Each structure stands twice: as structure tokens, then as C-alpha cells.
Amino acid sequence: MTTDTTVFVSGATGFIALHIMNDLLKAGYTVIGSGRSQEKNDGLLKKFNNNPKLSMEIVEDIAAPNAFDEVFKKHGKEIKIVLHTASPFHFETTNFEKDLLTPAVNGTKSILEAIKKYAADTVEKVIVTSSTAALVTPTDMNKGDLVITEESWNKDTWDSCQANAVAAYCGSKKFAEKTAWEFLKENKSSVKFTLSTINPGFVFGPQMFADSLKHGINTSSGIVSELIHSKVGGEFYNYCGPFIDVRDVSKAHLVAIEKPECTGQRLVLSEGLFCCQEIVDILNEEFPQLKGKIATGEPATGPSFLEKNSCKFDNSKTKKLLGFQFYNLKDCIVDTAAQMLEVQNEA
């Protein structure tokens, strides 16, 4: 790709998207982002020092019919790459269909329809930010003998994934991603773009802008924050699963743009498994100001817990395609927590 290429990033104010936009601008791309309001968009432009290669458009509700039409009517002839990062990720709902499933599917559908209507000849690549949640059924997550690969799919149906908020979130990622692959299959003759998906596990790592921590944080980072604020002798839920650093997620999007071998691939981002016990161990070992003030759980039992209680992820195909080393858990958690503590001290 030449660096005069224009990239559209949906959900531009999100945790992952801010890192992606920073990396795109550093690489010389022209970037158009979408945010929900003028206020959010203005705030974002200011954070990037009103970079002349960055502009923002308003998409109030990604689930609304024709949500992205205006953006592509206006910029369709400039945009060559589309990174669809916008998707609901929260568990504070009981109407799973309305708040998680439908918006995720409709958002994907509406951005692809807008490309077909207004940018069928110009958009060359679409990269959808999916999740490992699209690969594994939540009830299988604790099966120690199960191995998940780039070919795996979450087996939940539209109905069965509405059992609880976690299953519904995982279902929303599966059905949004399926929508993208099916759209391309059905519209091959009327669009020219190729499709890839990026499927990260739990995404940790520092915020692009530290002050984002003052306005609520993404769900994965919330796990680290809770453990930083845990009590001595306190119990914590030992979440476990695949993890990745946000800086690697961002880098993977850029590699997917630039490397033809990534076309048509599902890129599974995981640098191994984590559990909260391992995070607590890192916090106690690396931050003297926390030692003796937060929970300790059962130190050093993380690996044996994971062996028994988590399915395994084999993403060797992805690692070979991407060709770069991911952050390990210790560095990722240290950088995440250090930023949180710094912001806390300034408050």
C-alpha cells in the first residue's frame, strides 16, 4: 500500500481503534474515523493534535439502517481500506438480542452495504475486528483437552447464545463475523474488496491516551483494575482465557493491510493463556506499592489451573503469517497497571 492510501476506521474512539489510528498516522496513511457524536469526534481530533491527515465523521448508532451510508456517500471515492472495529462490548444488559446481537450484526451489514452502494469500485480491503469469542463456545472454554485454531467456530445458535450476557457477547462476535464472510460470498460479483478478520483474545495493554482511564475502561482492562483495587486476603474470580496486548492487535491490523498473504484469513491473536492468579502474581512481584495491600490468592498456581480449566489455542498459522513477536503477559500487565497507577496518583 502507498501511504497516500485512505483508511476508514469505524468505532474510532474505542480502546483498540485509537492505537490503530495512531499507528496508521505514523505510517503515513490518511485516516477517516467514525464516532458517535461531534463532541467525541472533536475530543479525538484534539488528542491527535488536529493532524491534517485525520478527519472524523458522525455515526450515531451503528445498528441503525444505512448507518454508514452518509460516510461512504461523502468519502466513497477516497477510501481504499475499511477497518470495522465498532461493536458493542458490555455485559450490563438483559435484552441480549437488542443490545448485543442485533447491533453487532447490523453494524457489520450496514458498513458492507454502504461500501457496495457507494464504494464498490474503490474499497480494496475490509478487515473486521472480531474476537476469539467467535471461535469457541463459552461452555467449552473450560475443556482442558480442546484445541482451538483459525478454523474453529463458536457453536452457539442465535437462541442458545442468549442464555447469559457472556454467551450473548460471544454470539454477537460470531454472528457479526459470519455476516461479513457470507456478505462477501453473496456479493462477489458486485464488490472488489477482499476480507480478513482479526480475532484477539482478552485485550490488555496501556490506553493510547492515559486520560481515557478517567472515562471508564474496556472490559478486559477492567479485570486488571479490579485486581489492583482488591483487598488483602480478598477473593477474586479467576477469569482465564487467551490474551493479547492492544499494541499487537493494532500492529496486526497494519500487517493485514500490507501483507497480501493475510487476505481471506482469520488472524487469531493470542500470546498464550492467562488467569487472574497470574495477573495478581505479577502485580505483587512488580509493584512494591501494591505488595501487602492487595489480594494474593494462591501464588504460582496459575499454570496448573490453566492446564485443567482452559481450552488451548493453536494460532501458529497466524503467527507465521504476521511474522512479529507478541508482548508476553508480564510486560503487557506491567505496562497496563503502571499507567493505571500513574493516573490514579494524579487524581
From Swiss-Prot:
Cofactor(s) needed by this chain: NADPH
Temperature effects on activity: Optimum temperature is 25 degrees Celsius.
Record-level Gene Ontology MF annotations: carbonyl reductase (NADPH) activity; oxidoreductase activity; oxidoreductase activity, acting on the CH-OH group of donors, NAD or NADP as acceptor
Keyword rRNA-binding: no
Annotated binding of NADP(+), by residue: 40, 169
UniProtKB keywords: Cytoplasm, NADP, Nucleus, Oxidoreductase
Any one Gene Ontology cellular component term annotated for this protein: cytoplasm
InterPro entries named among the record's database cross-references: Epimerase_deHydtase, NAD(P)-bd_dom_sf, NAD(P)_dehydrat-like
Compartments where found: Cytoplasm; Nucleus
TM annotation in the entry: none
EC number: 1.1.1.-
Domain of life per record: Eukaryota
pH profile of the protein: Optimum pH is 7.0.
Induction description: By furfural and 5-hydroxymethylfurfural (HMF).
Membership in a protein family: Belongs to the NAD(P)-dependent epimerase/dehydratase family. Dihydroflavonol-4-reductase subfamily.
Function of the molecule: NADPH-dependent aldehyde reductase involved in the detoxification of aldehyde inhibitors derived from lignocellulosic biomass conversion. Reduces commonly detected inhibitors in biomass conversion hydrolysates such as furfural, 5-hydroxymethylfurfural (HMF), cinnamic aldehyde, benzaldehyde, phenylacetaldehyde, and anisaldehyde.
Name the record gives this protein: NADPH-dependent aldehyde reductase ARI1
Organism field: Saccharomyces cerevisiae (strain ATCC 204508 / S288c)
